[in-house]
Amino acid sequence: MNYVWKDYNPDTMSFIENWLDESAVNTTGLYEGFRTFYEYWASEDGFVLGSNFWCKVAYEDNKPFAVIAFCQHEQKTIIMEVLVRPEKRGQGKGSTLLKEFLNNAGIIGFRIQKCEVENYPSNIASQKVFENAGFKYHHIHRDGNGDSMNYVYESSSLSTT
C-alpha cells in the first residue's frame, strides 16, 4: 500500500480533533487535543519543525485516516504519537502505515535506521500495531508520569528507497 503523505497543518486539519474519541484520549493521554500536543512540541526548546520534528498525515483514497508525530533525537527516530481515524481502527491499517513510514525514505527525506516508541501498558491494541510493524518490546520506562513500555525498531536493510 502506498499512502499519500502530507504535512500536518493545524489550521486546515482541525478534523483530526474529532478522531480523539474517549478511547483514543484514554490510550494516548491527549486530554487537551492533538493540536495542543502538536503546538507544544513544535515550540519546545530544541525541536525545529521540519528539521528534527515532523507531523505527517496519511491519506487513503483522498481521505485522511492517520496522523503521526515524530522527532529525531540522539541518532534515532522517536514516534511521539500515532492517531488513526476511529472507523479505520482494527483493520491492520496502523501496522501498514508504520511499515510504510519506516521503510520509505521519501516520506521524511531520510531512511529510518532505529526507531523507538513508548506505550501505556494498558494500550494493548497499540502494542499489537507496533509489534506487527516490526517493533520489539525493549523495557519498562518508569518516570513521574507512570510506567510505559518501550518498543524498538531497527532496520535490517541499508537501502535508501
Question: What is each residue range found by the language model?
Answer:
Residues 105-119:
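Conserved GNAT acetyl-CoA-binding A-motif
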Residues 116-118, 134-151:
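Conserved catalytic-core motifs of GNAT/GCN5-like acyltransferases
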Residues 95, 121-139:
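Conserved active-site alpha-helix within GNAT-family acetyltransferase domains
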Residues 59-61, 153-156:
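Active-site beta-strand termini and strand-to-loop segments that position acidic
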